[in-house]
Design a protein with these regions (language model features):
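Phosphate-binding site recognition
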Residues: 1-170
Length: 170
């Protein structure tokens, strides 16, 4: 389990052990746009509207190294025909922006630089040596990893899975 990449399902497991409203049908909505032009999503709501819980849920559902089936059994999403299609089939980059905002607050340039640095560092530790130039950033590194590995997110159970998926919470 990484700090940002393949973070695991502990966050959602903790939510499941508490009282919570089942919003797992959000997963069905994301699955519907997964391989379309509309696949880039931004979830914005006021404070205290459950964004963090939703992102923990999405992370637990998609995160490839996990086995989250038991967490979702009995929840609304488990009754959908395509429940298993994307379950634990994707590499996930999980960012909770509050961590970065607390540390780097009003300095947007520093904030972006540290996000790039921290995630690149973790990617390089996971996926080995990747040739980078001094001008490369996170997006360049993601493209190079997919090019060099033939698709980081692929697995035997989910051969069609997209290289990397990113979910951002702020």
């Amino acid at each position: 389990m990484g700090r940002y990449i393949n973070k695991g399902n502990d966050g959602f497991a903790s939510v499941c052990n508490s009282k919570f409203v089942d919003k797992t049908m959000l997963i069905e909505e994301v699955n519907l746009v997964m391989d379309t032009e509309n696949r880039f999503l931004c979830v914005t709501r006021a404070r205290r509207f459950g964004k963090s819980v939703a992102v923990k849920m999405l992370n637990a559902y998609y995160d490839q190294p996990c086995d989250s089936k038991s967490l979702f059994n009995g929840l609304s999403i488990s009754r959908c025909d395509d429940f298993l299609e994307h379950l634990n089939c994707h590499r996930v980059i999980y960012l909770d922006m509050t961590d970065f905002l607390t540390k780097y607050g009003g300095n947007d340039e520093l904030l972006v630089r540290h996000i790039n640095h921290d995630i690149c560092e973790e990617l390089l530790s996971l996926y080995g040596p990747v040739t980078m130039t001094g001008n490369d950033d996170l997006m360049d590194l993601l493209v190079k990893i997919v090019d060099q590995t033939g698709g980081v997110g692929r697995s035997e159970r989910c051969p069609e899975s997209i290289g990397l998926s990113a979910h951002v919470c702020s």
